[in-house]
From Swiss-Prot:
It comes from Geotalea daltonii (strain DSM 22248 / JCM 15807 / FRC-32) (Geobacter daltonii). CDD domains: cinA. This is CinA-like protein. HAMAP family: CinA_B. PANTHER family: NICOTINAMIDE-NUCLEOTIDE AMIDOHYDROLASE PNCC, NMN AMIDOHYDROLASE-LIKE PROTEIN YFAY. Belongs to the CinA family.
Length: 413
């Protein structure tokens, strides 16, 4: 099955509103194993809508259209659909009954303009709307099946899940889809591509793609086959090959994140953590405490942004700050040791750096970050030289901190 998505609305075309409907539909179709080669966006113009529908009908056998079914003058999708189908636009009894029922349910008198939402091509079949006023409709034109849905996301999703997707699934014309995602960091797309050359060799049903989601890269393996057993077998083989090649670069798989992986490792090992943050301003602590249950292992987090805070709260010697500077290996280690002694945690991680845009120098440019990890037996420090704006430096620093904790916990017996 080849499907296409057509989004209608001047607000989408002009970039005033982000088209979340298209991404939602695309994800649902992907999971259903439907091939989606085309997406289009057109404005609120009848002829443009008709021509877009004709184009998509020639390249696909299913088109999902969203937007333009409202009660206002710029909602012209039903008119365009009638012109496309060569069918008169007329009041639909089922849609009229829905409008009446909706008004009674919400105890609200609808404006006469809402009657426009009952107008549909005579050849159309109604798609019920359980949460709004605008019913959708489906029709067949030139051998292609069209589904017209409202643009309001909550209404669109309900109708998509309740009516459209079941109809597509029951057609039996979709493939069996299997996918696997490996999340890696510290390596470029080009390097990944070179490493994984030939990983799908011998499996025509398998493909591999890369998606950058700073500061990580997702390696996506997709298998599309006619039979479930075939798809399961291929994804297992190609997935294992990919995992073995990438090795320790993989920090998470599928729906996991670095945050959830670290949380799971703390729970598994029983270790506890405290933090001392300067340049990240509490971002690492936020990422940890965003997950429920973090109180079981996260004891304390201090944002010691100023030198005075480092001295008063962490016991960093004033002389050390004067001699080495706040952004230094020595101060990072002193911060980590101070956090661990103060909290009594098993591990304490500290970060100090220059997030920018000011504050850098030739010796310590913007993006310079010192990170220290103190444990029972030793305190280690690392120097990072990150690139990007202030937000990116803080984000990648928090990621690097979590990744260090991940590696540390994995090494524990």
């Amino acid at each position: 099955m080849r499907a296409a998505i057509l989004s209608i609305g001047d607000e989408l075309l002009l970039g005033e509103v982000v088209d979340t409907n298209a991404s939602t539909i695309a994800a649902r179709l992907y999971n259903l194993g439907v091939n989606l080669p085309l997406q289009m966006t057109v404005g609120d113009n009848i002829q443009d809508i008709v021509e877009a529908c004709q184009l998509l009908a020639g390249k696909s056998d299913t088109v999902i259209v969203t937007g333009g079914l409202g009660p206002t003058v710029d909602d012209v999708t039903a008119l365009a659909a009638a012109k496309l189908a060569g069918s008169p636009l007329e009041p639909n009894r089922e849609a009229l009954a829905h409008l009446k029922d909706f008004a009674e349910r919400v105890a609200e008198k609808l404006h006469p303009a809402n009657d426009k939402q009952s107008l549909m091509p005579a050849s159309a079949k109604v798609i019920p709307n359980l949460v709004g006023t605008a019913c959708g409709f489906s029709l067949v034109h030139d051998g292609c099946r069209f589904f017209f849905l409202p643009g309001v996301p909550g209404e669109m999703v309900s109708m998509l899940d309740e009516t459209v997707l079941p109809a597509l699934a029951s057609s039996g014309r979709h493939k069996i889809l299997r996918s696997k995602v490996f999340k890696v960091s510290g390596i470029s797309e080009a390097e990944l591509d070179a490493m994984l050359q030939g990983v799908t060799e011998g499996f025509a049903a398998a493909s591999i793609a890369f998606c950058v989601n700073f500061p990580e890269i997702e390696v996506k393996i997709r298998v599309v086959a006619d039979e479930k057993l075939t798809a399961d077998k291929i994804i297992a083989i190609v997935g294992d090959k990919t995992r073995n090649i990438l090795g320790s670069r993989v920090f998470a798989e599928d729906g996991e994140t670095i945050d959830t992986v670290v949380a799971g490792l703390f729970k598994k090992t029983g270790a506890t953590l405290s933090l001392a943050e300067s340049c990240t301003g509490g971002l690492i602590a936020k990422r940890i405490t965003d997950l429920s249950g973090s109180s079981a292992y996260f004891l304390e987090g201090l944002v010691t942004y100023s030198n005075r805070a480092k001295i008063d709260l962490l016991g960093v010697p004033a002389q050390l700050l004067e001699e080495k500077g706040a952004v230094s290996a020595e101060v990072a280690m002193a911060m980590a040791r101070g956090a661990r002694e103060k909290s009594g945690s098993d591990l304490a991680l500290a970060v100090t750096g220059i997030a920018g845009p000011e504050g850098g120098s030739a010796e310590k440019p913007v993006g310079t970050v010192f990170m220290a990890l103190a444990g029972q037996e030793q305190c280690r420090v690392r120097l990072f030289n990150f690139h990007g704006d202030r937000e990116q430096v803080r984000l990648v620093t928090s990621f690097a901190a979590l990744n260090w904790l991940r590696r540390e916990l994995l090494a524990r017996p």
